[in-house]
Amino acid sequence: MKHSANEIPARSGAVLSDIPALRKRARQNIEEGAVTTGYAADREAVIRMLNEALATELVCVLRYKRHYFMAKGIHADPVKAEFLAHAGEEMVHADRLAKRLVELGGEPNFSPDGLSARSHAEYVEGDTLNSMIKENLIAERIAIESYREMIAYLAEHDPTTQRMLKEILASEEEHAEDLASLLEGIKG
């Protein structure tokens, strides 16, 4: 197969854009930042989805912080430490989501108005150490399923957002395992 001098053969045999065409496309709509003409996802749907994920992470931060301060009992110290660590990690997730929203030309919705309605997970206070662990585990399981669905929706249409969501998903799975172990330890 012959290629023009400006075409770059890819490993799969597909041909990447010729350099002048690539340069021309990059100059179009430069105010869109990272979102180029090759962005294949429905940007408005992705922004809506990421704002729901942001709300979920923020609700999780608030729940974990409440549980950290309210946990008491003989087993409370290691559980509190886990709650505090998870709250910090969920805030990192929220920050990553907010940053990606801006990169996509959206606005991260940090408004407390409707936060619970936008969140996939619920804010449940819990009144015992056991119930707090269970509620956090349920919320992590909801987040895991939500992120899996988002990742599948994005497919190859937005690899950057998909990669970020896969990293957050891995963290949520670790949180769920941590909480399941804590729950087992308290029962044990």
Q: What residue ranges belong to the model's regions?
A:
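Iron-associated oxidoreductase/ferritin-like identity signal
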Residues: 1-188
